């Protein structure tokens, strides 16, 4: 049971992405600890706004290793949008900075997460 005012998304795809040289869809320079989510139009809605609002903190059910000495984290802030073709509706794409090898090795990991509304 989720606490009042929280949402849990179970068994969602997660992937990792790398720095492109651009700011996030929210207008910030990307930092380790952020993630991207689908835009509403990617899952049958309309518009470019994210399916989970920017600034929302997602708490994952497993620790995820991040590169560059960050280590393991289970909390990620939504600050970007992306396209995850053939991924679950509430897929998350975790920012891995410039460590392309680590992002590729991450692959697709199923996880669940909770966030406050």
UniProtKB/Swiss-Prot annotation:
Its EC number is 3.2.1.17. One of its GO terms (molecular function) is lysozyme activity. The keyword Signal does not apply. It comes from the Bacteria. The active site is at 89. Keywords: Antimicrobial, Bacteriolytic enzyme, Glycosidase, Hydrolase. GO terms for biological process: defense response to bacterium; killing of cells of another organism. It catalyses: Hydrolysis of (1->4)-beta-linkages between N-acetylmuramic acid and N-acetyl-D-glucosamine residues in a peptidoglycan and between N-acetyl-D-glucosamine residues in chitodextrins. Usually lysozymes have a catalytic site with Asp and Glu, but B-enzyme has no Glu (two Asp for catalytic site). This is B-enzyme. It comes from Bacillus subtilis.
């Amino acid at each position: 049971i989720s606490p009042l005012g929280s949402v849990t998304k179970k068994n969602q795809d997660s992937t990792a992405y790398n720095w492109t040289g651009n700011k996030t869809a929210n207008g910030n320079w990307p930092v380790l600890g952020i993630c991207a989510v689908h835009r509403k139009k990617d899952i049958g809605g309309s518009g470019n706004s994210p399916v989970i609002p920017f600034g929302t903190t997602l708490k994952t059910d497993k620790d995820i290793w991040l590169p560059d000495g960050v280590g393991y984290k289970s909390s990620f802030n939504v600050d970007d949008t992306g396209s995850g073709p053939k991924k679950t509706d509430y897929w998350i794409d975790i920012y891995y900075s410039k460590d392309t090898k680590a992002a590729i090795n991450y692959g697709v990991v199923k996880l669940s997460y909770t966030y406050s509304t």
